[in-house]
Curated annotation (Swiss-Prot):
Highest taxon listed in the record's lineage: Eukaryota
Primary localization: cytoplasm
Purpose: Guanine nucleotide exchange factor (GEF) which may activate RAB9A and RAB9B. Promotes the exchange of GDP to GTP, converting inactive GDP-bound Rab proteins into their active GTP-bound form.
InterPro entries named among the record's database cross-references: cDENN_dom, dDENN_dom, DENN_C, DENN_domain_containing_2, Tripartite_DENN, uDENN_dom
Protein name: DENN domain-containing protein 2D
Lineage, highest ranks first: Eukaryota, Metazoa, Chordata, Craniata, Vertebrata
Keywords: Cytoplasm, Guanine-nucleotide releasing factor
Organism for this UniProt entry: Mus musculus
Domain cDENN: from-to ranges: 226-359
Xref: Pfam families: dDENN, DENN, uDENN
């Protein structure tokens, strides 16, 4: 029966969500929500599917079912409406639009009108059949008006990973929603016509609001764009540094990781942050920041996954048949389940280096950009020290096609503890996908990771020069 339950879940994923591209993650049949935002060295541009900030603005509302007292999430507003689509495009859009309500209300269908409800900002990721990714940026709140109300969700679907910027856009949408839906339309139309700014640049929109007059809204993209899709502060607030390192170690070996929290915002931000620690590598397995109630059987899957589950479903999760899972309680800052060897996965010296770097001056950080850089840096440095020499072990044919020399690459690591780790890591999909891209490219991508590799190599040269003196 357990296998049948998982099978039903996977079939539902296939039917409700956009299909995966051929050849992706073959050990995850039916997987549809995959891969975090920071997919490649040029992450932000890998999402940019043209000039538009976004593809859709959707309003998802709760509508009572014909039978019973349950409610069903339904799209009640869509901008823009797509017309004259080809048959394949129409089918793809229909799959996308049928999946979105499920992720806007992942906590089930048992609702009642409310007089108070704390607004929530969260996100989800969908992968299309062609490999392009769409992010849903969501703001869930109570509509304006007298008496009890059912919450609704404003959901912006975009190909661009820039969470801080879209959070500000949702603030503007929320401000207008309190007046009228008619006020939202011209703002979103202006946004749709604006060009997405380059790193460090600003786009300014002119918008008219009744009783307030004309407003100018500035949307600025962070100068350092490689971390613009994530915010590490919530993860730091929920967990100790040692726990974050153990989660990283589990993810590096592509294990099953479940995050538990009460709020959707906490869940989605923490799981995005955990996946971002893997940079420049990509989580290539099931990845669902907030698992809808109807898909809870995902936690029984035998293949690797990184998922977020609301605390209200804790008992269902604990009653599910699971093996070798790291179950993280973000509310209490504890591990409810673990494999037991999480502290021993990384080379001890490098693990201590990460911990020391994270702890230095962490209380003096003020802005989210400072926090992001401080947290990400030690993990990037870990990969620089363990596998940063990869480019030297790609032999190229005359055509330019490269072939990775795995055995020589591993032998080049002089430290026994490092080599033991590297031999395991090269067998993961994280590393395999990264190397496949590197084999295709004649030169390493001139991005943040390559910059850190070159800095590290220069430091080693300078150290050797000093030792000779």
């Amino acid at each position: 029966m357990e296998g049948q339950g998982v099978g039903r879940t996977l079939r539902l994923l296939r039917n409700r969500l956009p299909r995966l591209r051929a050849g992706q993650s073959q050990n995850n049949p039916g997987e549809a929500v995959t891969e975090p935002e920071r997919i490649q060295e040029h992450s932000p541009s890998s999402f940019a599917g043209g000039q538009h900030f976004f593809e859709y603005l959707l309003v998802v509302s709760l509508k009572k079912k014909r039978l019973g007292d349950d409610y069903e999430p339904t799209i009640t507003y869509q901008f823009p409406k797509r017309e004259n689509l080809l048959r394949g495009q129409q089918e793809e859009e229909d799959r996308l639009l049928s999946a979105i309500p499920l992720f806007c209300f992942p906590d089930g269908n048992e609702w009642a009108p409310l007089t108070e409800y704390p607004r929530e900002t969260f996100s989800f990721v969908l992968t299309n059949v062609d490999g392009s990714r769409k992010i849903g940026y969501c703001r869930r709140l109570l509509p304006a008006g007298p008496g009890p109300q059912l919450p609704k969700v404003y959901c912006i679907i975009s190909c661009i990973g820039c969470f801080g910027l879209f959070s500000k856009i949702l603030d503007e949408v929320e401000k207008r929603h309190q007046i009228s839906m008619a006020v939202i339309y011209p703002f979103m139309q202006g946004l749709r016509e604006a060009a997405f700014p380059a790193p460090g640049k600003t786009v300014t929109l002119k918008s008219f609001i009744p009783d307030s007059g004309t407003e100018f809204i500035s949307l600025t993209r962070p100068l350092d764009s490689h971390l613009e899709h994530v915010d590490f502060s919530v993860l730091l607030h929920c967990l100790h540094l040692e726990q974050i390192i153990q989660i990283f170690a589990s993810a590096v070996l592509e294990r099953k990781i479940i995050f538990l929290a009460e709020g959707l915002s906490t869940l989605s931000q923490c799981i995005h942050a955990a996946a971002a620690l893997l940079y420049p590598f990509s989580w290539a397995h099931t990845y669902i920041p907030v698992v809808p109630e109807s898909l809870l059987a995902t936690v029984c899957c035998p293949t690797p996954f990184m998922v977020g589950v609301q605390m209200r479903f804790l008992q269902e999760v604990m009653d599910s048949p699971m093996e070798e899972v790291l179950l993280v309680n973000l509310c209490e800052g504890t591990f409810l389940l673990s494999v037991g060897d999480e502290k021993d996965i990384l080379p001890p010296k490098l693990q201590d280096d990460i911990l020391d770097s994270l702890g230095q001056g962490i209380n003096e950080l003020k802005t989210s950009e400072q926090i992001n850089e401080h947290v990400s840096g030690p993990f990037v440095q870990f990969f620089v020290k363990t596998v940063g020499h990869y480019a030297s072990y790609i032999k190229r044919e005359a055509s330019g096609q490269g072939h990775f020399q795995e055995r020589s690459f591993c032998k080049a690591v002089t430290s026994k503890t490092k080599r033991r780790f590297v031999k395991k890591f090269v067998k993961t999909q994280l590393f395999s996908l990264f190397i496949q891209e590197a084999e295709k490219s004649r030169n390493p991508p001139a991005g943040y990771f390559q910059k850190k590799i070159l800095e590290y190599e220069e430091q080693k040269k300078q150290k050797k020069s000093r030792e000779r003196l």
